[in-house]
Amino acid sequence: MARVAINGFGRIGRLVYRIIYERKNPDIEVVAINDLTDTKTLAHLLKYDSVHKKFPGKVEYTENSLIVDGKEIKVFAEPDPSKLPWKDLGVDFVIESTGVFRNREKAELHLQAGAKKVIITAPAKGEDITVVIGCNEDQLKPEHTIISCASCTTNSIAPIVKVLHEKFGIVSGMLTTVHSYTNDQRVLDLPHKDLRRARAAAVNIIPTTTGAAKAVALVVPEVKGKLDGMAIRVPTPDGSITDLTVLVEKETTVEEVNAVMKEATEGRLKGIIGYNDEPIVSSDIIGTTFSGIFDATITNVIGGKLVKVASWYDNEYGYSNRVVDTLELLLKM
């Protein structure tokens, strides 16, 4: 039985817990949560979700714990991870989902506290490995202690990049993620170090940065230096789409690109990348468990070598499923 703690019970932390609850894997037990607020608030936010709706179990709380279906989960509000009682609680894995402890030095604070491994739900620095399932999960090793799951956007497109590069050879490319707003934006016009993210999230189209394109090269090293991109934040709470345009070496057609991707989604990427051939919109993919859903209706090819593809993704729930998948892979080692 793996004992798991979740550090940061925000959008991703709560969904990771929900997915663990839904899967009912007998080998995983969430024993602790650390977040800088009170248990009443955490219980309410777990129970009610504006996007993913009401939690499927019974949620109660005490001063120092959450109680889900009668099972107690210890709750802490400690800003310094090195002071958390991971050793006393026998914590094997920490899901690091604060967005704060993203480099090796900070993530190691959990190890100092007694945890055995840390899974970071964001791009990281100094990690042992960045894992995107569908690309390089076979490189996970038992000795890895600090693991990054990259970003939701990287997960949405990297497996597709890998397939396209293997089949057609990517020369260069640009991606744009049209991304729902997140809590790293302001609800109203208020200060932010990114002056565009300082503007009201629900009433603006907001161009900003993404490291997703360059991060793809961490898991598909063959395209290192060949991709870049940007993000456009839009006034939706969840559901995003990554638009990728690449120049390829081998001439192709729309039909061939779609056939190659359909084969991949039914084979090695089954359950990771979905395939769509209907005129869907973003709300249609909320609650889907895929890292991305390849949209065959959007595929375009000009001159045989300029290829555009698109991948829908639930940037919260789909990504959180991959985090739990990564945890389950580590359990088997």
UniProtKB/Swiss-Prot annotation:
Alphabetical keyword list: Cytoplasm, Glycolysis, NAD, Nucleotide-binding, Oxidoreductase
List of catalytic residues: C152
Binding positions (NAD(+)): R11, I12, D35, T121, N183, N315
An example Gene Ontology CC term for this record: cytoplasm
Organism: Thermotoga maritima (strain ATCC 43589 / DSM 3109 / JCM 10099 / NBRC 100826 / MSB8)
InterPro entries: GlycerAld/Erythrose_P_DH, GlycerAld_3-P_DH_AS, GlycerAld_3-P_DH_cat, GlycerAld_3-P_DH_NAD(P)-bd, Glyceraldehyde-3-P_DH_1, NAD(P)-bd_dom_sf
Biological process terms in GO annotation: glucose metabolic process; glycolytic process
NCBIfam families attached to this UniProt entry: GAPDH-I
GO terms, molecular function: glyceraldehyde-3-phosphate dehydrogenase (NAD+) (phosphorylating) activity; NAD binding; NADP binding
Gene3D superfamilies with a match to the protein in the record: Dihydrodipicolinate Reductase, domain 2, NAD(P)-binding Rossmann-like Domain
Disulfide bridge partners, by residue number: none
Pathway noted in the entry: Carbohydrate degradation; glycolysis; pyruvate from D-glyceraldehyde 3-phosphate: step 1/5
Subunit structure: Homotetramer.
Annotated protein name in UniProt: Glyceraldehyde-3-phosphate dehydrogenase
Positions marked as site (Activates thiol group during catalysis): H179
Superkingdom as given in the UniProt entry: Bacteria
Enzyme class: oxidoreductase
Compartment list: Cytoplasm
Reaction it catalyzes: D-glyceraldehyde 3-phosphate + phosphate + NAD(+) = (2R)-3-phospho-glyceroyl phosphate + NADH + H(+)
